[in-house]
Amino acid sequence: MQRSPLEKANFLSKLFFSWTRPILRKGFRQRLELSDIYQIPLSNSADYLSENLEREWDRELASKKKPKLINALRRCFFWRFVFHGIILYLGEVTKAVQPLLLGRIIASYDPDNKVERSIAIYLGIGLCLLFIVRTLLLHPAIFGLHHMGMQMRIALFSLIYKKTLKLSSRVLDKISTGQLISLLSNNLNKFDEGLALAHFVWIVPLQVVLLMGLLWDLLQASAFCGLAFLIVLALFQAWLGQMMMKYRERRAGKINERLVITSEMIDNIQSVKAYCWEEAMEKMIENLRETELKLTRKTAYVRYFNSSAFFFSGFFVVFLAVLPYALIKGIILRKIFTTISFCIVLRMAVTRQFPWAVQTWYDSLGAINKIQDFLQKEEYKTLEYNLTTTDVVMENITAFWDEGFGELFVKAKQNNSDVKMSNGDNGLFFSNFSLLGTPVLKNISFKIEKGQLLAVAGSTGAGKTSLLMMIMGELEPSEGKIKHSGRISFCSQFSWIMPGTIKENIIFGVSYDEYRYRSVIKACQLEEDISKFAEKDNTVLGEGGITLSGGQRARISLARAIYKDADLYLLDSPFGYLDVLTEKEIFESCVCKLMANKTRILITSKMEHLKKADKILILHEGSCYFYGAFSELQNLRPDFSSKLMGYDSFDQFSAERRSSILTETLRRFSIEGDTAVSWNEGKKQSFKQTGDFGERRKNSILNPLNSIRKFSVVQKGQPQMNGIEENDDEPLERRLSLVPDSEQGEAILPRSNIINTGPTFQGRNRRQSVLNLMTRPSISQGQNMFKTGNAARKMSMAPQSKLSEIDIYSRRLSQDSGMDISDEINEEDLKEWFFDDVENIPAVTTWNTYLRYITIHKNLVFVLIWCLVIFLVEVAASLVGLWLLEDISFKDKTNGTNGANNTFPVIITDTSKYYLFYIYVGIADTFFALGIFRGLPLVHTLISVSKILHHKMLYSVLKAPMSTFNTLKPGGILNRFSKDIAILDDLLPLTIFDFIQLILIVVGALIVVSAIRPYIFLATVPVIIAFIMLRAYFLQTSQQLKQLESEARTPIFTHLVTSLKGLWTLRAFGRQPYFETLFHKALNLHTASWFLYLSTLRWFQMRIELVFVIFFIAVTFISILTTGDGEGRVGILLTLAMNIMSTLQWAVNSSIDVDSLMRSVSRVFKFIDMPTEEPLPAKPTKSLKKNQLSQVLIIENEHVNKENNWPSGGQMIVKDLTAKYTDGGNAVLENISFSISPGQRVGLLGRTGSGKSTLLAAFLRLLNTEGEMQIDGVSWDSIPLQKWRKAFGVIPQKVFIFSGTFRKNLDPYGQWSDHELWKVADEVGLKSVIEQFPGKLDFVLVDGGYVLSHGHKQLICLARSVLSKAKILLLDEPSAHLDPITYQIIRRVLKNAFANCTVILSEHRIEAMLECQRFLVIEDNKVRQYESIQKLVNEKSLYRQAISHSDRMKLFPHRNSSRHKSLAKITALKEETEEEVQETRL
């Protein structure tokens, strides 16, 4: 990064933001890179800010029993906050003085007041100076407040992250990842965005007192009629806001539900295509979308009328304020114009600024209280260790994960108590759990000496992982003692990879030792894998190691644990994803040799590992079932195999034990996995599903969170808005809502109508887009816009013209913003934070995108034409009013008046043009109703356009080839369906209407001005050109800076979630300070982009303001110098001048809004234009004859046309099969050829990453394939792709359970009856499981079916294959992490239901070999062997070495029938002698 010019900038450069010119110039000429961003000053660095706030917070904790976070913030930021507030107040006060000067200028042209004509020029100079002063005061004040809000957010970000790394595991049980993300994004945005609004809570009352005093001087008591109307209006809009909140709550559940299904579809797109579920998923999502859009339209209409009511009120405020005075005393034109100006300012203060300020304080204090509660939660307590201790000793250890856990099931028991069990079971699945805490470990005692290997075994839920957590200090013992040195290294069961290089993941901040590093790489079998990467061990891995296979991730995690020099190594099932050969080699070379001198605790279920262990600990239901050597085990515990291998079914566990198992499972999800649990105390723990899911989901237990499948227990009837669970005293929606929903300040930066930097103010509001949850405040004010993400949110500075609200040109319709649905979708709910959504689209939206958007709906063009016609009618009405004005004025001059003798107070007199004004307003308002309703068809049609684009994009994604998904990131795809569709639904319709209307207003005003003073028109032309040039100049840079900021925002949340996933590993390695440093670097990188964007935006807004001031000076003096007698004309000229330029400023800002939002349309079009999967017809080699089918049609094979007859046998022939993940990529399979007979079972063998799963995907045509494949004589080129895939039954490695009922998960197309479903469920062992849930087949599974075990999920996949009636079954490592009971069920079903089917199995378990007749050995992307298992083992191959002697005996039981033959075979299979232990031990 470059040094910032701000460091050397002088006062004027800082005042006018001129120091940003270099980056603006560079961004205009070329594409900006991260290296072009300026370094941040020390005052903005995360280290500096967090240190100051942390010091004050520690001081607060030490000094008081009830510490207050707001006191710590006050000591850090108070005086700067006050200073900027005073400057802001002075800028706002100038608005009250402007109407006085305007009134004096108008009065000076009264024929009866020629004395003041000589000072008109000085009054004009004063009016212009007021605009200059306000510009110089407001822009620095607003920038300073947002800068300070950014600093507060940074400091709190750091404080929360540091606290997260210290939280105890018990607290983490109760906090989901979604809650932490929401705490950082939604809540902390309030500081970034709302700080400038906070001062209006005291500025507005002072302003109202001042304005009412001035109005009293003009109108006496009648002025309070206008104020009363404004108060009523504010209450009415608050009521409309409540209506919008109701629609929002109802809509939130549908949006959430749609995004959950969409996210699951994207994450499991390979399974969706393998099952041929594209149509089912499309229908499911479109049904949810239809319901969502009905509520979207209702919400848009209410927002539209809410904003229209605000503008409509302009006439009535003035009318009610003037009418009583006019009826009693009569009124002169000067007072009317002055009153109009005062009322505009007063209306803005009462109905906009004050409610927003109160709402901001309410939200900000609520956020501070949430953060304060979080910072006071229980911390992880480091155990006291004795560094001289060499042994590991545990004495009578008993521990609980959560002593109050049983309360969770109270309501489940109540809800299920009235359900009768037909099979006589003693209760439902959840009603069997104990209501008391169950210890996860009970009376555990053992001692391990230095250098010994302890193997820990046990069935599922026995407490194995909890034992390691106890040793690490993550689980506090309630009884007993633990002794060890404290120098621990840890390898978790679920591999954790941090973003960084392979070397960084292994070294993990420890000092680099070349010899040790190479030894570990070799022992963990990583040499060959690393050599295949172009950058070797400097290859950068994404979050979670997404580019690696499961086995590679597992080996890197193991290497990290071993590289650290520790006294005790804790290895939690490190071999789960490894093939037989690799597991054997790593266990021997790494665990037994390299670490021979170290104390090791290994969790395993392999008999070979137990035999080589020095000590064995078998846990059963949390208790010690056996402790000792293997030689003692068989004698003392003959039934050890059932306890070890888990043959005691989960369903047969005691109620207490099942409670403990589920506790541990959920806890593990919340810390190490992608999912998280939110346990809330007491009354929050309900098993009723939220009403948003509708009647068909009424039996569900859990509420789905959004994009990354978080889950939480939800309160009955409370919609999930953030996708996280809040406490009862912290509702998801505000209980106070003074501001209409669409205008609440939760995610606003000062909007265009809030901080009035422009000469005129008309309320307008833009809310944060759905996916702008990161620290992305947006400034737009004065005529400013603060934008967030791709959705620009306006600071809402509307013109504050004097006559603008009464004059036809100022009567704008709803400028209401799209509501902030970040709470609803929580997308950016969480996926965006994992993925850099780098765009390859131009910095400015192309004209082709606009044209395509307009023409995608046939009615849109006609609606736009209709709006134009209405505009022309209004302009005509305005010209008629001007004609009347000129006519009456002329008559006044020639005939004089005798109004003083008239008996009616409201007539045209020599001092009054009230009647003229009345006619003018009346004619203009003739078209008011038409003006209000003219926007509704446009908004309605644009929402319909959004519906069409969503449908087209969903279809394109479902039909896209897998090669597309191999190049796109899931988070980027999900962003299109969440963030961009939300923009199309909420922000874009009203923003486009704003832009169209504002442009028409400017054009109409110019026409009227030209009719009065052509000189002003000539002055307007260069200003319009300057505006357009400034916009083009700024837009090129601002869009690039926003993109860089968006990319810099991603690593912040990625780092947080990554840290949470690997929290146990971080603590075990003591790497918290290292990760805090990385987090601060991510914060600083984002701050650099965001601060520069704020500064350049302020540069643009100030230049726009200065251009306006120059224009207004010109208009003022042209009006004063060229106008004779007649105050009406000069009044109209000045008010129209302010109105034209403020509206033009607004239009320029609105055009930037539209350009930003249309980038979402560009991205959607990019997805719509994705290539689709080829139908792969047989291309005719000759020209088609008359009766032949068109070349575009698929000519189906005659065998396939016979229903249910193909495939009949399951014979497969593969010839020269080559597969690639992407077009032009390297071949991952080369020239594969083999054949499989009908009903034959074939096993796939090969090292991890050799291509076994790839081959199965190639069978389904999920890759780019070349070559020939036939099933029962039918080539895959001769039939539709969907029909080809339906020939296969699939049990994928990644289990796919989408949010829906059991019935939908088994049969999404609804083809089978309940009888058939129950029959298949019984056949695969699922019937007893499904019957335990309320609703049975109609029970709704959410969050990937997390309430089911992994084995149960596999059985659902197996049931799908049975229902598919497929003749060929593909199984991709179905036994990975399965308990033996489920595995035995799968084996049984394969023997029975698929007895006559062809089965292709990729498996690591030796037992699976017994079921296969032949094996396909894949090595280096090619088929190395295709033989029977007997031949593979007889040969001197690697697989012979991997299979133990006892397993080889299992493979050939018939060879043991006679002693002679057996001895001969045993001699042939003689074990190799073990190599000597190398001197490379750690």
UniProtKB/Swiss-Prot annotation:
InterPro entries: AAA+_ATPase (IPR003593), ABC1_TM_dom (IPR011527), ABC1_TM_sf (IPR036640), ABC_transporter-like_ATP-bd (IPR003439), ABC_transporter-like_CS (IPR017871), ABC_transporter_C-like (IPR050173), CFTR/ABCC7 (IPR009147), CFTR1_ATP-bd_dom1 (IPR047082). It catalyses: ATP + H2O + closed Cl(-) channel = ADP + phosphate + open Cl(-) channel; chloride(in) = chloride(out); hydrogencarbonate(in) = hydrogencarbonate(out); ATP + H2O = ADP + phosphate + H(+). CDD domains: ABC_6TM_CFTR_D1, ABC_6TM_CFTR_D2, ABCC_CFTR1, ABCC_CFTR2. PROSITE patterns: ABC_TM1F, ABC_TRANSPORTER_1, ABC_TRANSPORTER_2. The keyword Glycoprotein applies. It is a multi-pass membrane protein. Binds and hydrolyzes ATP via the two cytoplasmic ABC transporter nucleotide-binding domains. The two ATP-binding domains interact with each other, forming a head-to-tail dimer. Normal ATPase activity requires interaction between the two domains. The first ABC transporter nucleotide-binding domain has no ATPase activity by itself. The PDZ-binding motif mediates interactions with GOPC and with the SLC4A7, NHERF1/EBP50 complex. Belongs to the ABC transporter superfamily. ABCC family. CFTR transporter (TC 3.A.1.202) subfamily. This is Cystic fibrosis transmembrane conductance regulator. It comes from Didelphis virginiana (North American opossum).
